[in-house]
């Protein structure tokens, strides 16, 4: 299904304020030993079908409510991903507004991660 114009405009606006990295750049940082908290912002059903190895789950619907309890360190490097990079961009914008300083949205999201053959797990 094609994304609605209003949604795409919200994402475009959010992307002006956030940092994005490609799937490959995120993997390079992980391989280099950078301390990264990888957060899957997809819906529960999407998470259950499989997710990036090492990721934690804070769905887009609850991330703003729960992130401070799950990741209290607002200086932590937090990489958010969703299906393709749109919802995670919106979430990254909100999380930054909450005072987190090192928030990154992974461009390409789950689709890019799996297409690159990177490690996944299924709960």
What are these regions (language model features)?
Residues 1-36, 41-77, 83-123:
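Rhodanese-like catalytic fold shared by cysteine-dependent sulfurtransferases
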